[in-house]
Amino acid sequence: MGIKHLYQVIAENAPDAIKAGDIKNHFGRKVAIDASMSIYSFLIAVRSEGQQLMSDTGETTSHLMGMFYRTLRMVDNGIKPLYVFDGAPPKLKSGELAKRTARKAEATEAHEEAKETGTAEDVEKFSRRTVRVTRDHNAECKKLLKLMGIPYIDAPTEAEAQCAVLARAGKVYAAASEDMDTLCFEAPILLRHLTFSEQRKEPILEIHLSRALEGLDMDRKQFIDLCILLGCDYLEPIPKVGPNTALKLIREFGSLEKVVEHMESDPKKKYVIPEDWPYQDARELFLNPDVREASHPDCDFKWEAPDIEGLVEFLVKDKGFNEDRVRNGAARLQKNLKTAQQSRLEGFFKPVARTDEEKANLKRKHDEKLQEQKKRKKEEAKAKKEAKARPRGAG
């Protein structure tokens, strides 16, 4: 799930932090990818007539189809992917996971009912809600990656946190995930939409943490507090606290401790904090997650030549894929992984830090932009009010 509305908050308040571009812009870059999030998206998106793809024996193959062709697309564009798989979830996440399981059970029931009485749209809607990534899905994807010559590692807990470690250490250029909480784990750069299909024509979004913090005028701890208030995987959200309120509260009070104190001392009790709301534990999980250091032997990885006959055996003979397409894909892998060895020029130079004057200018431009937005909203609200007050039929 990640952090609710965080992308919206950054886009509105720190637009310079987000850069949209083409996949080709990332030629020659190594990227650590959140495997579980990718597999989940493949299970939802790679479908035929609303149903997951199946082999002749009735086994789901959407995850393998997605993993093979989306990885191939990245390598075709000169990207060197490294997949990172989730380990055991932190204990604090178990409550959220239990809720997700309950929701999926309800969706399964509704899906069966829709098959009997509902429309095709109902069936597909509830079918997507029942999707979950299993151990078998993970194991099969790991087998496929090994045959493709694409490296993967297992994280102790959260894959996004391990991706962030590798990005901070410079072992990869960025962490790639649809989960915005990757930024809470201090990934310097987050890439979104990297594993989407070409047909969706979605630009790759590159989000820079340092620019987001600069635009929001927050330090990392305040940013994490904002994310917890927006709603994260570890805690229930506080009712009536939306993105604008969350941002206003953190800006006004500076920390969750003071926000909670304000809410609890409010005689009107405008906001009711859930009974069990260990926000300090959640913050600690973001600040000090269970990860391996980038120098750990388990974080060593390299790209190998694909095992073409092994891929044919697994994908064609076991899973019913088209042999010509698999062989063609393997040949492209072999050719393009060599091409991706070429380094980008940026790898030879360290980026120049912004001067205080440049930072001040950026902040001034950002503040002016915010004031302009507020002014426009005020004018729109005034015009709306006047239009409402005007008698019907009046020109």
Swiss-Prot record:
InterPro entries: 5-3_exonuclease_C_sf (IPR036279), Flap_endonuc (IPR023426), HhH2 (IPR008918), PIN-like_dom_sf (IPR029060), XPG-I_dom (IPR006086), XPG/Rad2 (IPR006084), XPG_CS (IPR019974), XPG_DNA_repair_N (IPR006085). It is found in: Nucleus, Nucleolus; Nucleus, Nucleoplasm; Mitochondrion. SMART domains: HhH2, XPGI, XPGN. The keyword Methyltransferase does not apply. Its cofactor is Mg(2+). Residues 122-253 are annotated as: I-domain. Binds 2 magnesium ions per subunit. They probably participate in the reaction catalyzed by the enzyme. May bind an additional third magnesium ion after substrate binding. GO terms for biological process: base-excision repair; DNA replication, removal of RNA primer. Mg(2+) 2 binds at residues 179, 181, 233. Residues 353-389 have a biased composition (Basic and acidic residues). Belongs to the XPG/RAD2 endonuclease family. FEN1 subfamily. PROSITE patterns: XPG_1 (PS00841), XPG_2 (PS00842). Its EC number is 3.1.-.-. GO terms for cellular component: mitochondrion; nucleolus; nucleoplasm. It is an enzyme of class 3 (hydrolase). This is Flap endonuclease 1. Keywords: DNA damage, DNA repair, DNA replication, Endonuclease, Exonuclease, Hydrolase, Magnesium, Metal-binding, Mitochondrion, Nuclease, Nucleus, Phosphoprotein. Structure-specific nuclease with 5'-flap endonuclease and 5'-3' exonuclease activities involved in DNA replication and repair. During DNA replication, cleaves the 5'-overhanging flap structure that is generated by displacement synthesis when DNA polymerase encounters the 5'-end of a downstream Okazaki fragment. It enters the flap from the 5'-end and then tracks to cleave the flap base, leaving a nick for ligation. Also involved in the long patch base excision repair (LP-BER) pathway, by cleaving within the apurinic/apyrimidinic (AP) site-terminated flap. DNA binds at residues 47, 70, 158, 231, 233. The keyword Ribosomal protein does not apply.
